[in-house]
A protein has these predicted regions:
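An N-terminal assembly and electron-transfer interface module characteristic of large anaerobic redox
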Residues: 1-399
Length: 399
């Protein structure tokens, strides 16, 4: 019996798969911290939900609060039970699943009796790519703490101190200034102490990101030495959550392929710009950079994870596909939501493997093309021979 969620058929011995799985590595590297014991925490316990932007920045916040003398209580890895804890306060069915999970994580912290919960709104991430148009977080990641604040009764009724400052991670100084504002008076912490903690936290976050890059390079070297193939399972930081990705990384491992994350290779081949899209979203920039590296190597392919309800990914899927297919690489996208059914994913992955085998047999040489486009400027002379199509998107669009 095969074809179900199990990676082996009935009666077969389970074989330990030793191929790299960077989803598993990243989960451990980013969240494998040991908090202070409560009797050592001079400022008590502070809860942090394991959601959305925390998959990008938790090492920073853990280090900051630990250095300041807090015992950090992190909500557990997502499960269906966690999701159901907060289901009553979810305001819209059309939200992406990672956003819906946030309600359950915050409710779990409340159930533990935590009096302070920290979950910041971060419109700007650090600028990882200097030539990108900007470095925003998406609207959901940016403002979801506001949604939590207005839809969860214990917070609305003031039973919990919900700390949700708007701040930018563009620079260490910017964060330090805001943390002094938010934490200094509230917890009677000296400005110098906060700035020192922010510095240590900034260094720890940089170390985490460097470790991911090193692990990516090690995995690529491993694939070269062993002759194995790898899949870059590209998505958002929160797609490393097993409840969100539904075990797809392990499924790929079961087909004897290594699994890499987009941020483990996004530094290896800078994107040629300008792109066809406005490259202003931080997580998107990594997707484009990862695809730009994958197009240059034969033993890597890319599968993009796309959450239902993510409007911005309508842009990324087209751009990532364009970068890959222009250099004769295969683009595969997997849409995921709260439904835990890997049947369709298995079919897509098997189809990708079959297509790869066919291409290897043909041994066709690929023409690797830059990701940039040549934009044509509209000149005065074109007025007589060209028509501009510009649909009116709102009543005052042309005013």
């Amino acid at each position: 019996i095969t074809g179900n969620r199990c990676e082996r058929g009935l009666g077969k011995e389970k074989v330990k798969n030793k191929l790299p799985n960077l989803f598993e590595y990243k989960m451990q590297r980013y969240f494998g911290y040991t908090p202070l014991k409560e009797n050592e925490a001079v400022h008590g316990v502070i809860g942090i939900p394991r959601v959305l932007n925390m998959y990008e920045n938790y090492p920073f916040w853990f280090t900051l609060f630990t250095k300041l003398g807090f015992s950090v209580l992190l909500s557990p890895a997502s499960t269906r039970k966690i999701y159901e804890l907060g289901i009553e306060s979810i305001p819209s069915e059309s939200e992406c699943y990672p956003a819906k999970l946030a309600h359950g994580h915050v409710q779990w912290l409340i159930n533990q009796g935590v009096t302070h919960i920290f979950y910041p709104s971060i419109p700007y991430e650090r600028k990882e790519f200097a030539d990108a148009n900007n470095h925003y977080n998406c609207p959901i990641v940016t403002s979801y703490p506001e949604n939590i604040k207005n839809n969860m009764d214990p917070i609305v009724q003031g039973e919990v101190d919900f700390i949700h400052p708007f701040l930018s991670l563009e620079s260490e100084e910017t964060v330090a200034y805001r943390m002094v504002e938010e934490l200094g008076e509230k917890f009677s912490i000296d400005e110098k102490e906060i700035r020192a903690a922010v510095h240590d936290a900034w260094e720890e976050l940089a170390a985490c990101r460097n470790d991911m890059r090193k692990k990516g390079e090690e995995t690529i070297q491993f694939l070269k030495e062993t002759g194995n193939r790898g899949i870059v399972l590209a998505g958002r930081p929160y797609h490393i959550d097993p409840e969100v990705n539904h075990g797809i990384p392990e499924l790929i491992n079961s087909y004897n392929m290594a699994v890499l994350t987009e941020d483990s290779i996004s530094h290896l081949n800078p994107v040629e710009r300008p792109l066809n899209v406005m490259d202003q979203w931080m997580y998107h920039s990594r997707l484009y950079a990862a695809a730009n590296y994958v197009k240059t190597v034969d033993n890597l392919d890319l599968i993009q994870l796309n959450s239902f309800g993510c409007g911005l990914d309508a842009v990324t899927t087209d751009q990532v596909a364009e970068i890959l297919t222009n250099s004769d690489k295969i683009y595969t996208s997997l849409k995921i939501d709260e439904v835990n059914n890997l049947g369709a994913a298995r079919i897509r992955i098997r189809s990708l493997l079959a297509a790869i085998r066919v291409r290897e047999q043909r041994n066709t040489k690929r023409d690797i093309k830059p990701a940039s486009i040549d934009k044509v400027s509209f000149t005065k002379e074109m007025r007589t021979t060209y028509t501009i199509l510009c649909p009116q998107m709102s009543p005052f669009h042309f005013e």
